[in-house]
Swiss-Prot record:
EC number: 3.1.1.96
NCBIfam families in the cross-refs: D-aminoacyl-tRNA deacylase
Keywords recorded for this protein, A-Z: Cytoplasm, Hydrolase, RNA-binding, tRNA-binding
HAMAP family named in the record: Deacylase_Dtd
Protein name per UniProt: D-aminoacyl-tRNA deacylase
Species annotation: Bacillus pumilus (strain SAFR-032)
InterPro entries noted in UniProt: Daa-tRNA_deacyls_DTD, DTD-like_sf
Domain notes: A Gly-cisPro motif from one monomer fits into the active site of the other monomer to allow specific chiral rejection of L-amino acids.
Cell compartment(s), UniProt: Cytoplasm
Source superkingdom: Bacteria
């Protein structure tokens, strides 16, 4: 499972001109699922994300977690995180999980965050989405449960 985490002051996602999710301070997270992923990967990354210290303390050091600042998550499914660009000019997405399996693990990931007390807003799985955000810092982190 892969995540691209962006620290934001605000973020929202629209599907067909309807806002399906919006947050203020927190993380906008792109979530990608591959064939080998299990619930173990989900829980590992949900825990890591909840406790990742990339919010600044009073001294300007990245020392506070999402839980510390009571931030929210805008979670957006993103199969293209498994795009392979090594051959040709068009990405190959064969490493991305099939939609049914990916959606189940994506929903499990969001549930795991909610169980930690984190407010989670989402896009719509498999839909064409427009994501808007204000990246704070900017701070962008790549996380992979296998690496």
């Amino acid at each position: 499972m892969r995540l691209v985490v962006q620290r934001v002051t605000s973020a929202s996602v629209k599907v067909e001109e309807e806002i399906t999710g919006a947050i203020n301070e927190g993380y906008m997270v792109l979530v990608g699922v591959t064939h080998e992923d299990t619930e173990e990967d989900v829980h590992y990354l949900a825990d890591k994300l909840a406790h990742l210290r990339i919010f600044e303390d009073e001294n300007g050091k990245m020392n506070h977690s999402l839980l510390d600042v009571k931030g929210s998550v805008l979670s957006v499914s993103q199969f293209t995180l498994y795009g392979d660009t090594r051959k040709g000019r068009r990405p190959n997405f064969m490493k991305a999980a099939k939609p049914d399996a990916a959606n189940a693990l994506y929903e499990c990931f969001n549930k795991a965050l909610r169980e930690k007390g984190i407010h989670v807003e989402t896009g719509r799985f498999g839909a064409m989405m427009d994501v808007s955000l204000t990246n704070s810092g900017p701070v962008t982190i790549w996380m992979d449960s296998k690496e």
